């Protein structure tokens, strides 16, 4: 069972004590903090897990042959939903840094998407390098890709999944050699 969480230490502890897999909707740095809490709390519950074991990081991907092509994909597949959907979460949460950008051109939302630490925008090698760097400190067992199916052509979604599976995941798998769960109990 995966339990989505974004910023609550209590949610991490809840998941750890029940054996649920936390699905972190947060930056790499915040996810690393949560993974340490999860590992500590799981141990209290009788499960000796490695750091990152049973944990998942959520990422959105825009992969291109060049950085420019990846940004073009953001413009065509992600900028609209970022502007008209995700931007409202900051307002609802009462975030002081939220502002009304509803009249801003769609192109300006490309930068907003690219600056979000949950979004991976670039070439296969640049994204793989960034994730490998993060996994060296916090080797998460799972990586969750959430595509914007309504905005993104299915061929691009399928190609992104293929690139993650064949070009990115093998490098991450080298960093996540965990004991079996039976050995953790």
Predicted segments, located by residue:
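Glycine-rich, proline-tolerant flexible connector loops at the mouths of alpha/beta enzymes
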Residues: 26, 146-157
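Short glycine/threonine-rich loop-to-helix capping motif typified by GTGT followed
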Residues: 66-67, 153-163
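A conserved active-site cap/scaffold subdomain adjacent to cofactor or substrate pockets
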Residues: 7-29
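An alpha-helical appendage that flanks or caps ligand/catalytic pockets
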Residues: 31-140, 173-184
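Active-site-proximal loop/turn and secondary-structure-junction residues that shape catalytic pockets
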Residues: 7, 28, 61-62, 149-151
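Hydrophobic faces of well-ordered beta-strands that scaffold small-molecule active sites
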Residues: 1-4, 22-24, 53-59, 143-145
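Short, acidic/polar
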Residues: 5-13, 126-133
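Conserved, mostly hydrophobic/aromatic
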Residues: 1, 15, 38, 70, ...
């Amino acid at each position: 069972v995966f339990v989505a969480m974004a910023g609550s230490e209590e949610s991490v502890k809840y998941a750890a004590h029940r054996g649920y897999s936390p699905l972190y909707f947060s930056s790499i740095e915040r996810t690393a903090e949560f993974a340490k809490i999860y590992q500590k709390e799981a141990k209290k519950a009788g499960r000796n897990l490695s750091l990152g074991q049973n944990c998942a990081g959520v990422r959105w991907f825009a992969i291109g042959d060049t950085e420019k092509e990846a940004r073009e994909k953001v413009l065509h597949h992600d900028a609209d939903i970022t502007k008209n959907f995700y931007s409202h979460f900051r307002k609802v949460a009462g975030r002081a840094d939220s502002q009304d950008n509803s009249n801003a051109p769609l192109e300006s939302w490309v930068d907003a998407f690219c600056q979000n630490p949950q979004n991976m925008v670039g070439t296969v090698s640049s994204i793989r390098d960034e994730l490998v760097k993060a996994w060296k400190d916090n080797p998460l067992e799972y990586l969750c890709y959430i595509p914007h199916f309504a905005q993104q052509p299915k061929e691009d979604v399928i190609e992104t999944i293929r690139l993650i599976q064949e070009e990115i995941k093998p490098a991450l798998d080298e960093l996540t050699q965990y004991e079996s769960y039976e050995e953790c109990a």
